[in-house]
């Protein structure tokens, strides 16, 4: 079940607000300029989905995002618990960073934890299957895929080469709850 937990950026041990209600999550995130929607990810992809099959299955949704926002490219990220690079990739995404473009993800399988740092707060968004999340450019954030990652998400980009992360140098992510 999708969820949102909001913390002060000074007190990671004490949540200020928490919900698993999609409408409440959407209201909180819309207030800070972040798009959160529940779409339908109802295509069976199998155990190890190939990127081409995922894109073909959800081309209509990709076309919708491109038409709405002018995105230029897209790809698929799929991570499984047996991926030999999972620990290194998890560490890479756990560092707070920004992008010069929106970070758009449509989860078609599994889950991941997006953490946004703005307005002296940390917003932890547990994204699950059917969740579309669009984080505007330049918002500091990090992503936790967990120690046994299991998700497939479509990523949509402004830049045809994909996103380029810029580290903030802040170690704030180290103090907040992570996925198991």
From Swiss-Prot:
The record marks 96 as: May play a role in metal incorporation in vivo. Pathway: Amino-acid biosynthesis; L-methionine biosynthesis via salvage pathway; L-methionine from S-methyl-5-thio-alpha-D-ribose 1-phosphate: step 5/6. Binds 1 Fe(2+) cation per monomer. Ni(2+) binds at residues 97, 99, 103, 141. InterPro entries: ARD, ARD_bac, RmlC-like_jellyroll, RmlC_Cupin_sf. Its cofactor is Fe(2+); Ni(2+). It comes from Yersinia pseudotuberculosis serotype O:3 (strain YPIII). This is Acireductone dioxygenase. GO terms for molecular function: acireductone dioxygenase (Ni2+-requiring) activity; acireductone dioxygenase [iron(II)-requiring] activity; iron ion binding; nickel cation binding. The keyword RNA-binding does not apply. Monomer.
């Amino acid at each position: 079940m999708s969820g949102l937990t909001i913390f002060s950026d000074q007190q990671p041990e004490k949540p200020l607000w928490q919900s698993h209600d999609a409408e409440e999550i959407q209201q909180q995130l819309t207030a800070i300029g972040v798009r959160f929607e529940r779409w339908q990810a109802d295509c069976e992809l199998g155990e190890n989905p190939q990127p081409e099959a995922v894109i073909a299955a959800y081309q209509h949704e990709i076309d919708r995002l491109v038409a709405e926002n002018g995105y230029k490219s897209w790809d698929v990220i799929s991570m499984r618990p047996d991926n030999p690079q999972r620990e290194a990739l998890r560490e890479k995404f756990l560092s707070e960073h920004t992008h010069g473009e929106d970070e758009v993800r449509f989860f078609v399988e599994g889950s991941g934890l997006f953490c946004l740092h703005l307005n002296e707060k940390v917003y932890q968004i547990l994204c699950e299957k059917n969740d579309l999340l669009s984080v505007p450019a330049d918002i500091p954030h990090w992503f936790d895929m967990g120690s046994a990652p299991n998700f497939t998400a479509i990523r949509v980009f402004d830049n045809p080469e994909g996103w380029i992360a810029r580290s903030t140098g802040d170690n704030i992510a180290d103090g907040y709850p992570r996925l198991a």
